[in-house]
């Protein structure tokens, strides 16, 4: 029996290979970064107190690429049409380019506008290779006419906004240990489920590999982190999530595939939009670092570092479950009920713990240490 004849088996192998490879490579990357001084030094606005290597994205990219290459060499891509096979490699190339832009920023501190220009250029390049929004299917308005084909100019604009927007939303989310990797991993698992329910096998393979490298990296990045993914890692995660969401339908963007990433990533997207609007209202650059982000607000409200991250995790998994309902996936209502129960329980327990800690603080304010993570760290 050929296990790789099953799409689920291929996705499972892809996930495991990416997770194991990333987990094994992270310590090597960390040692390399410490040896050459490629670290993020602590200062008065940052929460870490020792130099932290910011090159964890290297291990993630290598884990992702290794998993896809291994599955391909074992014949796993034989389940795909040649056009879908090409889309996987185009997505991998785009992910690598976005990673290199972020890596250059990690090493040389690029200014925002050159980074943005590079992102737009790469997005245009992958659009030319077929990773594009070519049509929009809105069944409520186009039931008889079918999908609305987009002119090339509009298709290019929509694709660039989609890819660059989601990439930077994930990048700006990378403000606490484990936050970006965890949210991206949850989103990737949601994409695996929906992709297979819609028979979008290529997208499922990509999402499974992405979920694997997120899981492997979290082993070293969850609080207290031993390494940061850096802008290279967050750009890689954001671009890959955005690209996977349009690789499934390839030439067109259906209502379901549009709502899925918007639902799963609505929290970081809304946070990014609110932060940009707030900065612009004050006459500041949209790239000006501050403490407006949701995770900074939760920290200031008194939640600990870990509790803040877990709250955002459970809300993201609830949004992913809601996306499964929209996609009409199997057992969708069971997953939504379970996700809702987890969300409600986490919120209730977190509020009670916070109230208890505040009561202790009011009773004996000198006996309760201040959580240094409550200071936050603006990274975007």
What are these regions (language model features)?
Residues 28-53, 274-306:
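Cytosolic, membrane-interface loops and tails of multi-pass inner-membrane proteins
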Residues 320-338:
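Extracellular/periplasmic helix-loop-helix junctions in multi-pass membrane proteins
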Residues 2-272:
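"…together with the soluble PPM/PP2C metallo-phosphatase catalytic core" -> "…together
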């Amino acid at each position: 029996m050929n296990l790789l004849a099953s799409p689920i088996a291929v996705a499972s192998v892809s996930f495991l290979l990416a997770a194991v490879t990333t987990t094994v490579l992270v310590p090597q990357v960390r040692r390399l970064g410490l040896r050459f001084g490629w670290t993020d030094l602590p200062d008065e606005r940052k929460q870490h107190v020792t130099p932290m290597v910011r090159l964890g994205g290297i291990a993630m990219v290598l884990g992702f690429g290794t998993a896809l290459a291994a599955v391909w060499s074992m014949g796993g891509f034989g389940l795909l049409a040649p056009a879908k096979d090409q889309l996987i490699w185009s997505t991998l190339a785009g992910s690598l380019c976005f990673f290199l832009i972020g890596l250059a920023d990690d090493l040389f501190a690029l200014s925002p506008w050159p980074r943005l220009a590079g992102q737009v250029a790469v997005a245009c390049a992958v659009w030319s290779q077929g990773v594009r929004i070519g049509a929009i299917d809105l069944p409520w308005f186009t039931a008889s006419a079918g999908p609305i084909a987009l002119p090339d100019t509009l298709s290019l604009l929509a694709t660039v906004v989609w890819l660059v927007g989601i990439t930077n939303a994930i990048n700006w989310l990378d403000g606490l240990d484990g936050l970006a990797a965890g949210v991206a991993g949850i989103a990737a698992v949601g994409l695996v489920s929906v992709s297979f329910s819609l028979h979008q096998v290529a997208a499922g393979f990509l999402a499974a590999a992405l979920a694997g490298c997120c899981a492997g990296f979290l082993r070293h990045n969850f609080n207290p982190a031993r390494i940061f993914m850096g802008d290279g890692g967050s750009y890689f995660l954001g671009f890959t999530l955005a690209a996977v969401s349009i690789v499934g339908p390839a030439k067109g963007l259906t209502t379901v595939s549009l709502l899925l990433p918007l639902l799963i990533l609505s929290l970081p997207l809304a946070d990014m939009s609110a932060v940009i609007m707030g900065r612009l209202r004050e006459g500041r650059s949209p790239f000006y670092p501050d403490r407006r982000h949701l995770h900074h607000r939760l920290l200031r409200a008194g939640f600990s570092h870990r509790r803040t991250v877990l709250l955002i995790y459970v809300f993201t998994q609830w949004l992913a479950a809601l996306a499964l309902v929209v996609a009409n996936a199997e057992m969708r209502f069971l997953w939504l009920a379970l996700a809702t129960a987890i969300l409600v329980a986490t919120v209730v327990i977190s509020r009670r713990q916070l109230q208890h800690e505040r009561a202790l603080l009011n009773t004996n304010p000198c006996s309760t240490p201040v959580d240094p993570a409550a200071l936050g760290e603006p990274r975007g």
